[in-house]
């Protein structure tokens, strides 16, 4: 069952900043009217801030829940002077020199004395600026960056693997995956698009002002960003990671051949782990799922670039023995420059006739599922941005022989149970057979990333009145199919600057 938050929990981050329930401070007499204190939540946390606000009010101090023109003293904990100034810039308060910016030690000293203490140098953060590392974004990076020029489409942005905002995008991807498990496509895409935007930024986000004017920054997204800036982590993402349903779905979908529907079915049956599924002999598993469980340990481990290169050599050599003019291209994350992945995708094409099942006779495939082509010539591209293509495909598990390695650190109890040391690894491989004239479109689609492909198709539809999929590009106004012999030609048809594969990690 989906977890329901109790109504007392404030759902929006802005209201959490809002910081305090007025009725808690009712009845306290204000003894020191000349001082108006604001306690920064950044790096302190909401619980501690609430406690300190209540304690100070009980001592007769006037403490504001929100930063306003009446505030005279700003108190911070574990923040340097430059960090406080950075934070103030994002609050649009104008001239910050009117504030006394003080360390938390000043407020605790005041409460111990029961009255305001003198503003000695030791309490002023400006005197302690060197004590803490500053998180300030270099001005040169921000000043040269114009948020309004950031496109809502990732196909108009360049996104390398150098992600300056991983702490935010990791949280977004956890949220998106949870919504995907719940089949809530709208919220899932909201977080994926936001993650895509932040991945393209050339600098780390350290304040809310940094995201002003950026596309795809809705309220839910901004709440998560603000909490991470202030607390260092997202409580919502942590809640998801600890959620029983999410953990089960995450584990179930790691099995080859298991999707959200099957995970939902197993979860409703009371199953929670892969081990529980394997132990339930009443379950009827598909051929693909049986293979997924049989080679589970290998398939859930990462595939290295070296392993991908080794598999690529096997596939190319095998294909070329019966199809000398074939073009075999590794696609997916490895084409975009990634060093690790979970499977390997290959695109295979040839100008001439072809035989598609030769790999099956080489003893290299532990499992394969061939999907025949369903493409109809002159078929209009699909309207759906996530539509499957119609190529002939082979979803396979390949046996990759590996040199023996020193397993001295390996769990000996497990090692002793093995009749012999395994000298191969099962690796997921997708082989996609495409007609030569559709190769450029297939290469663009199968290279990814998934979000880059989505945005490319959205851009074609909404900005160019065209329809794009992995087979073709159709101009609705001219009512013609646009031929392309390369990815560069497709970008040119769409009126886009060419984006290199390693710049498509949206």
From Swiss-Prot:
Q: Which GO terms describe its biological process?
A: DNA metabolic process; DNA modification; double-strand break repair via nonhomologous end joining
**Protein encoded by which gene:** DNTT
Q: Which reaction does it catalyse?
A: DNA(n) + a 2'-deoxyribonucleoside 5'-triphosphate = DNA(n+1) + diphosphate
**Signal sequence residues:** none
Judged by the first EC level, this protein's enzyme class is transferase
The protein's name in its UniProt record: DNA nucleotidylexotransferase
Family according to the record:
Belongs to the DNA polymerase type-X family.
Region: Involved in DNA binding, residue numbers: 258-262
Single annotated GO MF: DNA binding
User: Is Transport a UniProt keyword of this protein?
Assistant: no
Q: From what superkingdom does this record's organism come?
A: Eukaryota
Function field: Template-independent DNA polymerase which catalyzes the random addition of deoxynucleoside 5'-triphosphate to the 3'-end of a DNA initiator. One of the in vivo functions of this enzyme is the addition of nucleotides at the junction (N region) of rearranged Ig heavy chain and T-cell receptor gene segments during the maturation of B- and T-cells.
Q: What subcellular compartments does it reside in?
A: Nucleus
A Pfam match is HHH_8
EC number, as in UniProt:
2.7.7.31
Q: What is its main location?
A: nucleus
The cofactors named for this UniProt entry are: Mg(2+)
- Chain ranges of the BRCT domain: 27-124
> Which parts of the sequence form the motif Nuclear localization signal?
11-17
Q: Which organism is it from?
A: Gallus gallus (Chicken)
Q: Which UniProt keywords apply?
A: Magnesium, Metal-binding, Nucleotidyltransferase, Nucleus, Terminal addition, Transferase
Q: Where does Mg(2+) bind?
A: 343, 345, 430
Tell whether Nucleotide-binding is among the UniProt keywords: no
Cellular component GO terms held in the UniProt record:
nucleus
What residues bind a 2'-deoxyribonucleoside 5'-triphosphate, as annotated? Answer: 333-338, 342-345, 445-446
- Describe cofactor binding as the record notes it: Can also utilize other divalent cations, such as Mn(2+) and Co(2+) (in vitro).
